C-alpha cells in the first residue's frame, strides 16, 4: 500500500513545492514508484516537472468537480517511475464549485484510494493556505511533511499548521501524523539560520530530518528549466540534499 505524504505549510515561500518536486524525483530515481499530486492552483509543481499548464485538458480541478475520471487525469511517466496529477489556475475555482457538496473533504481521498496500491509513494503538494484543497489533501494523507524556511517568522507559520493538523485529526482523519520537519533555504553563514533550527527543535517534539536543504543557486534555477534538481544538476549541493532526504523518508519506519 502506497504511503501518502502531504507536503504542507500555510506560510508561502518555504520551499514546499521545491521539496515536493525534488523529493518525488529522488524517490523515483531510487526505483520507487511515485505519484505526485499538484493540489496548488499556482501549478508550480506541474510546470516544475516540465509541463505547460495552459495546454492541459484534464487536471485535479476536473477530477475534484467530477468532470473526468482519475485515469484521465494521471499523466504517466513524466519521469521514469514518476507520474503526475497536474494542476493549473482553474483549481482556484474549486472552493466555490464545492459549496454545498456533501462530504467534500473526502473527494480526493475517494479517488486516490483507488490507485494507492499502484505506487510506493504518493506526494501531495498542498496550497499555502487553509482551504478545501488543503483539507482534502490532509484527509487523504497518512502523514504531513513540513518544510520550514530558516527565517525569522518560521515559528509563526508552524503554529498555524499544527493547529490545522489537529483539527483534521479531530474531525476527519484521526490517523494523520506529522511525517517530519525539513529545514530549507539554510545558510550556515548566518546566525539566524542556526537560531531558527534551535527554536523549532525546542518548540516541536516531532521528527526533524537530519538532512537540511541549503540555499543553492542551481536548486533555484531548476524550476525555470522544468527539471528536478537531480536531473538539472545531479552533482549540485541541492541534488545531494534531496537524495539524502529521500533516503531518510524511505528508511523511516511506517505503521
Feature names for model-found ranges:
Residues 1-255:
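P-loop NTP-binding core
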